Amino acid sequence: GLLSNYEHIPLNHPLSVTVPGAVAGWRELSNKFGNIPIEDILDIGINLCHEGFKISKELFNSLNNHSEELSGQSSGYSFYRDNQPYSIDTLIRRPQLGKTLELLKEHGLEYFYNGEIAKEISNSVNGLLTKDDLSSYKAIWREPLHQKIYGYDGWTSPPSTQGYLTLSTLKGFEIINNKDDYLHTLIESYRIFASDRDNITYDYQGNDQK
């Protein structure tokens, strides 16, 4: 099989891609909590894509830090020129993304998983995501993780996300008594709880170590 050529799943490769879940999540959220038509919500994104938005300092820093991975992608032209990110306050437009949102507005959110968009997604990863992979995808409601931290309620998403790292690290702060130990404790607490990430959360549903 394809994976036999690799000791680990390559990071920037179609083998590392899973079915995009955001659109299915929008549908669930809209159906359960929404009182604004999804078409009106999509209009906001469509207008932003075509009218443009300015690059903030935070976005610029992120684009700069990840330019090696992002600048060569097909959508990278919106944010990069000659492999360098556009400067802060540059007006950016995303016409291709706007067109995608327009198709979802016209055909419904399910078009993302069953229509031409699904075919393009499959083709972009050399068929490693199949038609059935996409059409059968469903967003799942899960109980959030909860932890009391300094008397406050902390909530985050459960595995297979890495939200547990945030709660576990913050909980570790409660044992800090010496300000000089703050940074060391911050680093070590994160390292400890991150150590199980690749062994457990990568396939949480199929892993018994929960």
Predicted segments, located by residue:
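Noncatalytic scaffold domains of N-terminal-nucleophile
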Residues: 1-161
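Generic recognition of short, well-ordered alpha-helical interface segments
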Residues: 21-24, 164, 184, 188
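Generic recognition of well-ordered alpha-helical segments
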Residues: 25, 100, 168, 172, ...
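Short helix-capping/linker segments at secondary-structure and domain boundaries
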Residues: 31-36, 106-109, 173-179, 198-201
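M16/insulysin-pitrilysin zinc metalloprotease superfamily fold
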Residues: 163-177
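Internal maturation/activation junctions in enzymes
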Residues: 177-210
